[in-house]
Amino acid sequence: MPHNSIRSGHGGLNQLGGAFVNGRPLPEVVRQRIVDLAHQGVRPCDISRQLRVSHGCVSKILGRYYETGSIRPGVIGGSKPKVATPKVVEKIGDYKRQNPTMFAWEIRDRLLAEGVCDNDTVPSVSSINRIIRTKVQQPFNLPMDSCVATKSLSPGHTLIPSSAVTPPESPQSDSLGSTYSINGLLGIAQPGSDNKRKMDDSDQDSCRLSIDSQSSSSGPRKHLRTDTFGQHHLEPLECPFERQHYPEAYASPSHTKGEQGLYPLPLLNSTLDDGKATLTPSNTPLGRNLSTHQTYPVVADPHSPYAIKQETPELSSSSSTPSSLSSSAFLDLQQVGSGGPAGASVPPFNAFSHAASVYGQFTGQALLSGREMVGPTLPGYPPHIPTSGQGSYASSAIAGMVAGSEYSGNAYSHTPYASYSEAWRFPNSSLLSSPYYYSSTTRPSAPPTSATAFDHL
């Protein structure tokens, strides 16, 4: 076959045993043979085996032939013709100079509208951007890599670099400098203009294009200097750092005298003395078993004395109630009248048949609120279990709730609780007659709401 007689040394054998050359297209004769076999109805896989050409090469050649009708290599997928012709580049430059903000796709549409290019020769958007970047804007950004341009200048002309031009001074700058500089804030006067700081660009300093600049560069080059501050300038700057932002137990030696005088010691002592004077000591004894402070409204006279009565049980009683003041079972509070003996002013005590009673007068501040002492932990108020409910409790359950010394198996029937009336529980009669609690007049019923009216329908 013709492709086997090709010069050896630059190719090899493919997977089918056919010879090929790297980087070279398939010979024209083989291409024509592939097309002829395809017209005869031979499948591409059979063509590949007969001609020993890879299946990909056969498919590519046949596909290109069906699309374009050509079997020549490089027609599809090859190098495109050059679209960046001098005429197109010149037009793109004209459009960009007329409208510098013109986009590449606008330039492409204008090239097609004016007939400069057709659909096959018009450059792409990326090509137009590359042309603008490399060929249109290049004359405006010529780098100054050499100083050859000085030879074309006449002796009377001087090319001054842009960095040598002094920028206009700010209207806020004065003899003290800019108001935003450190010297301007601190009020430090700057030296004369002959001693001002000069910053020269190292790249353009090597290319001095004038005789005056070359003569000035012969002198020693000035370096950047740092501003030095005196002691009178450093002290105001260090004051904010010496101030203590957090309270400390011990005074720091770095505090200034002005800061030490902010809170003098006599002022603190006088404040402590005033605070101590407002605290009044209380000698009121506290009752036992008062674990929590319970507060109720005041219903009694705040200055009426109270008596603590200890009752001695009868000898015939089967209860094992202790008869000491520390007992919490039979310790009661009774209001004692202001005149006469205590026994005559308390009628409920006459119902008792005890041999002796012990009374103690207490007029402390802790008993001012009357009902403040009444609570579940008040001595003299044991846990009361109603008679109707005693049947549902076992003896062991009741014994677990009440201490053995304060529990009796019999039904609890204490005479004072039966004889105490509502007048004792509410000494202030205004509470009983208050229309808030007991109103003799019938209150008008509220008008039925929408939901209630709907229920009655």
Swiss-Prot record:
Residue ranges the UniProt entry marks as DNA-binding: 9-135
Polar residues composition bias: residue spans: 159-182
Modified residues (Phosphoserine): S304
GO cellular component labels: nucleoplasm; nucleus
Keywords, ordered alphabetically: Developmental protein, Differentiation, DNA-binding, Nucleus, Paired box, Phosphoprotein, Transcription, Transcription regulation
Pfam families in the record: PAX, Pax2_C
RED subdomain: region residues: 87-135
Location(s) in or outside the cell: Nucleus
CDD domains: PAX (cd00131)
Chain spans, region Disordered: 159-226
Annotated stretches, region: PAI subdomain: 12-68
InterPro entries assigned to the protein according to its UniProt record, in alphabetical order: Homeodomain-like_sf, PAIRED_DNA-bd_dom, Paired_dom, Pax2_C, PAX_fam, WH-like_DNA-bd_sf
Molecular-function GO terms, alphabetical: DNA binding; DNA-binding transcription activator activity, RNA polymerase II-specific; DNA-binding transcription factor activity; DNA-binding transcription factor activity, RNA polymerase II-specific; RNA polymerase II cis-regulatory region sequence-specific DNA binding; sequence-specific DNA binding; sequence-specific double-stranded DNA binding; transcription cis-regulatory region binding
Gene Ontology BP term (one): positive regulation of branching involved in ureteric bud morphogenesis
Function text: Thought to encode a transcription factor. It may have a role in kidney cell differentiation. May play a regulatory role in mammalian development.
Quaternary organization: Interacts with WWTR1.
Protein name as it appears in the record: Paired box protein Pax-8
Organism in which the protein naturally occurs: Rattus norvegicus (Rat)
Gene label: Pax8
